[in-house]
Amino acid sequence: YYARSMGLPVKKLICASNRNNVLTDFFLGGVYDTRRQFFKTTSPSMDILISSNLERLLFECADRDGALIARWMQQLRTSQSYAVGQQRQEWLLSVFAAGYADDRDCAEEIARVFEQHHYLMDTHTAVASRVLRQYRETSGDSTPTVIVSTASPYKFAADVLTAVAGKNAVAGL
């Protein structure tokens, strides 16, 4: 976000979530609400209901009004939700696109990318890749994109192998 603010020619930042899509719902609806079911997924580092460091973005979204951020965080602690209002949600959507992918989507994405590009990705990167593809299909935006992938597919070997070779590939392991 800050690089974009300083002039890096970035059209959209894309927030990709797994089935615990609290951030997708927040960006699209303007309400951060943790009163929802929590799911354990194949992308466990994304298994969250309370996003760390979101308040840094909110600080910019709220014109650096720290008192407003403190109120929102207090509302989150006491009522498990807060709303940023239409104007701030529109600001968020002017900068960000958001989407989510469930475990099946991720497995399909791992297999697709492996088959088409001979690249083996982890489950977290599959979330990002799938959401980017969904964004491109719905928006028509074909801007060159960078996905920041920080996990090894071998750390999630069973899920990645199942995605590429099928359920029987891990039977008995």
Whereabouts are the PLM-identified features?
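PLP-dependent amino-acid enzyme catalytic core
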Residues: 1-173
